[in-house]
């Protein structure tokens, strides 16, 4: 052992000495150094150029339109647009070979995954693996973070098994609908804006922060009550995120019950919606993620009645932060669902802001209109955040004016002086609740806990799931929000006249129309599209110039003697 160690040491020292000699020789050869530094040996540019690599990747990249057929335009926002699409591989997904083989690799996300979701999981896996390992788009596979944990565990003692209706109680009609849905899988494609008015080539700033956050979080998070990201496309400086499609959202459902006449949402349906929302929010918060934009338009409902939280564009992690929340995003949450601590100018906040938004959604499901429908004050030219006086006053009129006793450290908020200028209001939440048609005292109790002024005392998502509103009563909480309904909600409105995604790959800057200068050689040029030959116009102009020239010369001759006389 000693001899082998000595030999190894000798070999290592010999290698180091030879390496040093080689470096010395290179230093001698490279006598023409700049600033006393040996120039770095670089390969030929033909070897390390990026152009062939980009060309090869662009040629191998699968286009979003090659894989999906766009059906129509759904909605738009500050982020971009959302389109409904179906997979061009749907016929292949219905085959037994592809679907059955991939269904084994796809695991259900929660205990609520019924027969439909398991069957769709196989088809969903087929969609993701349709192009094999050579596909250049980003697949949002499963949960890659070991820290992420799902609450929906059958062994979780906190969730009473008696309050969950099993998915095996579906009737035959729903089973037939699920079988039909297997042949055609629909998706929602979210296209992010990356340019301004077609001048992306001049002012392209890269991928937005919102898109980066949503891509990063959606690839990690995996819960049955969050919209599932299928894959991501990067094409022509545009981001395309493909999600599972949800036929409804809460805004659409609320509008259906409030127009043309007011029809209350069934209490059993509201309870199912709230339980699933809180379950998804609980999963986010347990994994240190704030949503920061919860509202009815961002709460999706699938055809199977599963509630899914979507639009994580404003979401962010709140663990191990290097700066306050306010530094990154000064304005978060839509104004009607914004927590009072945000309205008072809090520079840092907690997951309690999401629970306030959930309380506002709960009240809107009961009353069929926003409970705090204020008017938003817009930012000025200096981009300073204005004080939302009208919105805060709407809250005070229903919940009453907070006091330092009910809300400690209230005086420390930046906008406390503005709050002190308002008149004193009394708590009127019970009156609003009964006028809106609410009858369940447990629902009113949960609403009080969610709309608590003090963010420290505001109930969190885990404890809200244990509230008596969900555990009390004979009717259990069902997984399908449409359970027991004798009517159907209309499908999403699809616009087929606004499919600019179909022009994919034609992102060119808007070039102003070229102004063609008139030339004497162009005999076919026209004036104003009237077909007037420019040669004729030129001849007429020359004749007019000649006539005017003769008259002007004659008049100049007549005027010249007079000028001489004046002199």
Curated annotation (Swiss-Prot):
It is found in: Nucleus. The keyword Magnesium applies. It comes from the Eukaryota. Its EC number is 2.7.11.22, 2.7.11.23. Residues 167-179 have a biased composition (Basic and acidic residues). ATP binds at residues 74-82, 190. It holds the Pfam family Pkinase. Its cofactor is Mg(2+). SUPFAM superfamilies: Protein kinase-like (PK-like). It catalyses: L-seryl-[protein] + ATP = O-phospho-L-seryl-[protein] + ADP + H(+); L-threonyl-[protein] + ATP = O-phospho-L-threonyl-[protein] + ADP + H(+); [DNA-directed RNA polymerase] + ATP = phospho-[DNA-directed RNA polymerase] + ADP + H(+). GO terms for molecular function: ATP binding; cyclin-dependent protein serine/threonine kinase activity; metal ion binding; protein serine kinase activity; RNA polymerase II CTD heptapeptide repeat kinase activity. The active site is at residue 293. Its main location: nucleus. This is Serine/threonine-protein kinase SSN3. Component of the SRB8-11 complex. The SRB8-11 complex is a regulatory module of the Mediator complex which is itself involved in regulation of basal and activated RNA polymerase II-dependent transcription. The SRB8-11 complex may be involved in the transcriptional repression of a subset of genes regulated by Mediator. It may inhibit the association of the Mediator complex with RNA polymerase II to form the holoenzyme complex. The SRB8-11 complex phosphorylates the C-terminal domain (CTD) of the largest subunit of RNA polymerase II. Component of the SRB8-11 complex, a regulatory module of the Mediator complex. Residues 90-101, 546-556 have a biased composition (Low complexity). GO terms for cellular component: CKM complex; mediator complex. Belongs to the protein kinase superfamily. CMGC Ser/Thr protein kinase family. CDC2/CDKX subfamily. Residues 102-122, 133-150 have a biased composition (Polar residues). GO terms for biological process: negative regulation of filamentous growth; negative regulation of transcription by RNA polymerase II; nuclear-transcribed mRNA catabolic process, non-stop decay; positive regulation of transcription by RNA polymerase II; protein destabilization. Residues 68-470 form the Protein kinase domain. Residues 88-179, 546-567 are annotated as: Disordered. It is an enzyme of class 2 (transferase). InterPro entries: CDK (IPR050108), Kinase-like_dom_sf (IPR011009), Prot_kinase_dom (IPR000719), Ser/Thr_kinase_AS (IPR008271).
């Amino acid at each position: 052992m000693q001899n082998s160690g000595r030999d190894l040491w000798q070999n290592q020292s010999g290698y180091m000495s030879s390496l040093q000699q080689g470096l010395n020789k290179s230093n001698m050869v490279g006598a023409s150094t700049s600033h006393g530094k040996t120039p770095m040996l670089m390969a030929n540019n033909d070897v390390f150029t990026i152009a062939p690599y980009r060309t090869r990747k662009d040629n191998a990249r699968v286009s979003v339109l090659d894989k999906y057929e766009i059906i129509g335009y759904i909605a738009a926002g500050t982020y971009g647009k959302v389109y409904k699409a179906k997979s061009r591989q749907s016929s292949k997904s219905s085959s037994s070979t592809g679907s059955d083989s991939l269904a084994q690799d796809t695991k259900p996300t929660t205990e609520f995954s019924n027969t439909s979701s398991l069957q769709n999981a196989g088809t969903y896996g087929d969609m993701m693996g349709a192009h094999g390992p050579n596909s250049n788009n980003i697949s949002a596979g499963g949960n890659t973070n070991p820290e992420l944990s799902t609450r929906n565990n059958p062994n979780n003692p906190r969730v009473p098994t008696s309050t969950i209706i099993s998915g095996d109680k579906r009737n035959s009609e729903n089973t037939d609908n699920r079988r039909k849905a297997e042949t055609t899988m629909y998706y929602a494609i979210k296209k992010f804006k990356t340019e301004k008015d077609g001048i992306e080539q001049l002012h392209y700033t890269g991928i937005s922060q919102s898109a980066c956050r949503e891509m990063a979080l959606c690839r990690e998070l995996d819960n049955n009550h969050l919209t599932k990201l299928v894959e991501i496309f990067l094409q022509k400086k545009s981001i395309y995120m493909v999600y599972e499609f949800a036929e409804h959202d809460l805004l659409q459902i609320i509008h259906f019950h409030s127009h043309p006449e007011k029809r209350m949402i069934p209490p059993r349906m509201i309870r199912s919606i709230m339980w699933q929302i809180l379950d998804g929010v609980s999963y986010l918060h347990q994994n240190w993620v704030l949503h920061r934009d919860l509202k009815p338009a961002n709460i999706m409902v699938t055809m199977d009645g599963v509630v899914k939280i979507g639009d994580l564009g404003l979401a962010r992690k709140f663990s191990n932060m290097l700066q306050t929340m306010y530094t990154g995003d000064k304005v978060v949450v839509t104004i009607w669902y914004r927590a009072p601590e945000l309205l008072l100018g809090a520079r840092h906040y907690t997951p309690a802001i999401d629970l306030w938004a959930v309380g506002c959604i709960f009240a809107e499901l009961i009353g069929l209109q926003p409970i705090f429908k204020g008017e938003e004050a817009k930012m000025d030219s200096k981009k300073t955040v204005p004080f939302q006086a009208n919105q805060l006053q709407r809250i005070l009129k229903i919940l009453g004016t907070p006091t330092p006793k009910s809300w400690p450290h209230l005086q420390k908020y930046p906008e406390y002086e503005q709050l002190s200028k308002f008149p004193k209001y009394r708590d009127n939440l019970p009156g609003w609740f009964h006028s809106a048609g609410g009858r369940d005292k447990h629902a009113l109790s949960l609403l009080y806990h969610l709309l608590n002024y003090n963010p420290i005392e505001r109930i969190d998502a885990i404890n809200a799931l244990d509230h008596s509103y969900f555990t009390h009563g004979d009717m259990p909480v069902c997984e399908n929000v449409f359970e027991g309904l004798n009517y159907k909600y209309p499908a999403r409105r699809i616009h087929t006249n606004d499919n600019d995604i179909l022009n994919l790959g034609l992102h060119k800057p808007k070039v102003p129309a070229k102004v063609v200068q008139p030339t004497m050689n162009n005999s076919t040029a026209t004036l104003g599209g009237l077909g007037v030959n420019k040669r004729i116009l030129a001849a007429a102009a020359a004749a007019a110039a000649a006539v005017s020239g003769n008259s002007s010369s004659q008049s100049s001759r007549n005027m010249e003697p007079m000028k001489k006389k004046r002199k």
